[in-house]
Amino acid sequence: EFYGADGMEGIIHPLNDDWMIGSLQFGGKRRTKDGGYNQDGVNPDDFSGDWVTPLMYDPNDQMTIYTMTNILYRSDDFGSTWNTLGDSFLEGNIQNAAIAENSSAIAISNYNRLKISYDGGMTFTEISQSLPNQFITDIAFDPNNDDTIIVTYGTYGNNNQKVYLSENQGETWQNITYNLGNMPIRSVVIDHT
């Protein structure tokens, strides 16, 4: 147990596993720099995110972390200070997010809407026009090709609309659900090992 309550998103610094941030419901965050012996709160001012609020670090600079409400926040010092980035113009809080490995692209979603930023979160463009009107459960960039994005859906129906692939950062989408069953898809990772 890191802090108690409902455990949500967490990150461990990839170069120093004594540095961690754990989060609670609605995005409350606690940080430790000594493996959990001491903790401090590290939220942006007046912060209230979604029930499970996205929290992630930049794969190009692990001291840079992101969290979000309907606005994206970035910390360049592992949570000590926060900068407000662009407004997503989504109705409600951002529920899912992914950061590209090799560029400044960030994808975000709320319910059935998916947007992408090409400038590190300052502005966003809608890319969900040709996708199903269903609840998006996860987003992933291909770690070897930032143009490739996969989006998953959490529907129970036998609608064959669970997993979609774009190879051009969301300009066009291909349904790659194939023969998956009637269960919702909750998470996706692209693995090239």
Outline where the language-model segments fall.
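Beta-propeller blade termini and top-face loops
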Residues: 1-193
